Every structure is written in structure tokens, then in C-alpha cells.
């Protein structure tokens, strides 16, 4: 469902006509020229490595379980894009427990507009609460910058706890969008 910018006359008119907000999304933006991989993440990497968790580029035949991890997320868009990207040699960052894929972000490449593309970021249900999401996201920002992207943008729900990771990496909310519904 498309969202309606909440700072527009259309949004106010729809409210007046009985439409209500089902959910609110925010668009967030980061100018990558300002991004620096922080020392606190290097420390986190060392701590996580001591517990067997790493982030690295996906390597076919070396790491295992990418298909199963993506399937466990129950997201049809990711199921259609991420396994083919991984098996097709695209640049995909993965969170690992040993050699088992525990999370992903990417594929990583700059779009012609200069925007750093990524389909999403997720950590599988059995691997959450170890810091992989934060580490994957910071590694993603650095990888996008390194491959020539000038900025990154994303949509996320206003109640999504991951927005705290995005904000800590320097992302700023630029606009809010309401997904509107109306009973007929």
C-alpha cells in the first residue's frame, strides 16, 4: 500500500473524509560522505568474534544455510531476491555463527542515482539478540560508501525498534507517510 505524506493537504483531506492511519512509515536518509565506521563497532566485532559471531561477504560453498535463514523470515520479497543474489555472486553481507548464515543485508551496489541499494536487513529468529543486526547495518553503510554510493535511504515503520540502529549510524528522518484505510 502506498503511503500519503503526512505534511500534505491530501493527507488532511483524507482524514476529513473518514480515512484513518493504519500505520505510519518514515523515510530516513544518510549522506555517506559523512559516514565513518566507528571504533565502538570495531570493539563490538571483537567481542562478538569471541562468541563465534562474524559479518563477512557471502561465499558460495564456504558458508551454509542462506536459503533456510531467509525462508525462516517469511518475507516473500526477500525470498525472491536474496537467495538468487547470494548464489549468483552478487555482493551480499551475511551475519555468521561459525559458517552458518544467521542474517543478511544487501545485495550491495550503488544505483545510477548514487543511492546505495539494499533489499533489506534481517537476522534469523534463532540468532537474534547477539548484536548481529547492528554490526550488519554498520558494515552495510561502510560497504555502500566503499563501492561508490553517495547516500542511502530507507523506509521503516515508526514503531520499528531497528530505527534506533539507523539513527545511531547517522540516518535522519526526512518525512512521514501514513498508510490510510477506510471502511466502506
Protein language model features and the residues they cover:
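Acyl-donor-binding surface of acyltransferase catalytic domains
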Residues: 1-49, 178-182
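Conserved GNAT acetyl-CoA-binding A-motif
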Residues: 1-3, 144-155
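Conserved active-site tyrosine of GNAT-family acetyltransferases
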Residues: 14, 166-167, 171
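Short amphipathic alpha-helix that is part of the acyltransferase structural core
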Residues: 25, 39-77
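A conserved beta-strand-loop-helix scaffold within acyl/acetyltransferase catalytic domains
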Residues: 73-125
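Conserved acetyl-CoA-binding loop-helix of GNAT-fold acetyltransferases
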Residues: 123, 129-142, 146, 164-168
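Short glycine/proline-centered loop/turn elements that form peptide/ligand docking sites
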Residues: 137, 159-162, 184
Amino acid at each position: 500500500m502506498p503511503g500519503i505524506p503526512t505534511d500534505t493537504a491530501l493527507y488532511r483531506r483524507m482524514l476529513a473524509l473518514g480515512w484513518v492511519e493504519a500505520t505510519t512509515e518514515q523515510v530516513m536518509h544518510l549522506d555517506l560522505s559523512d559516514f565513518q565506521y566507528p571504533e565502538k563497532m570495531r570493539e563490538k566485532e571483537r567481542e562478538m568474534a569471541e562468541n563465534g559471531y562474524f559479518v563477512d561477504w557471502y561465499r558460495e560453498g564456504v558458508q551454509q544455510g542462506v536459503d533456510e535463514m531467509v525462508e525462516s523470515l517469511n518475507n516473500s520479497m526477500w525470498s525472491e531476491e536474496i537467495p538468487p543474489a547470494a548464489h549468483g555472486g552478487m555482493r551480499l553481507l551475511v551475519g555468521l555463527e561459525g559458517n552458518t548464515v544467521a542474517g543478511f543485508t544487501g545485495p550491495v551496489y550503488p544505483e545510477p542515482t548514487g543511492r546505495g541499494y539494499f533489499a533489506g536487513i534481517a537476522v534469523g529468529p534463532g540468532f537474534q539478540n547477539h548484536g548481529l543486526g547492528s554490526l550488519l547495518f554498520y558494515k552495510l553503510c561502510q560497504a555502500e560508501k566503499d563501492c561508490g554510493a553517495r547516500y542511502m535511504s530507507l523506509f521503516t515503520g515508526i514503531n520499528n525498534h531497528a530505527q534506533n540502529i539507523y539513527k545511531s549510524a547517522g540516518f535522519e528522518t526526512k518525512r512521514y507517510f501514513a498508510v490510510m484505510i477506510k471502511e466502506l
